[in-house]
Amino acid sequence: MPNTTTTNSPVPVRHWLRIIVRSVFILVILLAAAGFFYENISEARDRRFHPMPGQRVDVGGYKLHINCTGQGAPVVVLDSGLGDSNVSWMKVQPQIAKFTRVCSYDRAGLGYSDNSPRPRTSKVMAEELQTLLQNAGISPPYVLVGHSMGGYNVRLFASLYRSEVAGMVLVDSSHPEQEKRFPQALNDMDKTWVREQEFMTLAMPFGIPRLLGFCGSDAKVRAADCNFHSYREGLTELKTFPEGAAETATTGSLGDLPLAVLSHDPNAPVSDIPADLVKPMNDAWEQMQDELAHLSSRGTRTIAKNSSHYIQLDRPEVVVEAIRNVVDQARQLQSERNQSAEQK
């Protein structure tokens, strides 16, 4: 018999690479699917246990969410900062409702509001707010309260609908020249922030921000804010922020409108900005806040001690007191006008 030997040829490396790539691909698909279901179940759970307060009102083919409490006039209208929903006012609205009617709302695409087909500029947001108030049957006069970017919106509202506005409170409001006056290194950080927000928006449908703890521990906040459409709208507002600044720069004086300007404590610790940028940033901010207070001959300015940018969360009593003072001034001025009209 012939001498024969059997040789087992090795499996090519390419074969094993294909197996590994396929396995990784399948694993990624499974993890993405698991994250997708986790996110959707979590959103549904949060909103089931914390249902939407207030109502949704049609403003021209899409609906915006508004929540009004209390009674009396003028009506206080709360406009949140960039990417924030109505829940940013949760510590102040119940207190304001004790002395007048107060409404918080969600801009289009945020919280419980639908997306809008219109450009996301501050002028458009002011127009949408006026339509929302009108369609919801909430009559002027209004005391407008704007936090951060919301300050642009309420100033544009006052410019467009001056006869409907009885007073204004600016809560650490943005200034239309802030990007020009801040250190360039700080503006460069904004570009990094945009990239981070783009990643978070893409990751949101798969539950990654929630898993990383970015949604927070308050279920009421999660129900309104922790969802894909809110993250996407926040990113859009971030990208159109310069347009809002340019629009606001065209608005003029507020005349003798009752005005309160609240500013964060420049000595409060700042964790997300390099130490060498904090002082020049705060110096510029202080000057710009003074300029905001001088928009009206009745303007006042208060620094909220031990408060960050979110004064309404850190020092809600300061915000409530400022709003109360402006409401009282507006009522007094209206009373004087009524008496003057009766004497004629």
Go through each PLM region and give its residues.
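Conserved catalytic-core motifs of eukaryotic protein kinase domains, centered on the activation segment
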Residues: 88-90, 113-119, 180-181
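Flexible "cap/lid" subdomain of the alpha/beta-hydrolase fold that forms the substrate-access gate
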Residues: 122, 164-294, 299, 303
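Active-site loop/oxyanion-hole signature of alpha/beta-hydrolase fold enzymes
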Residues: 67-69, 104-145
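Conserved hydrolase catalytic core segment
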Residues: 139-182
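Catalytic active-site module of serine/aspartate enzymes centered on a nucleophile-bearing elbow/loop
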Residues: 14, 22, 296-344
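Alpha/beta-hydrolase fold catalytic core
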Residues: 2-74, 98-100, 328-344
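Conserved HGGG/HGGXW glycine-rich cap/lid loop of the alpha/beta-hydrolase fold
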Residues: 62, 68-112
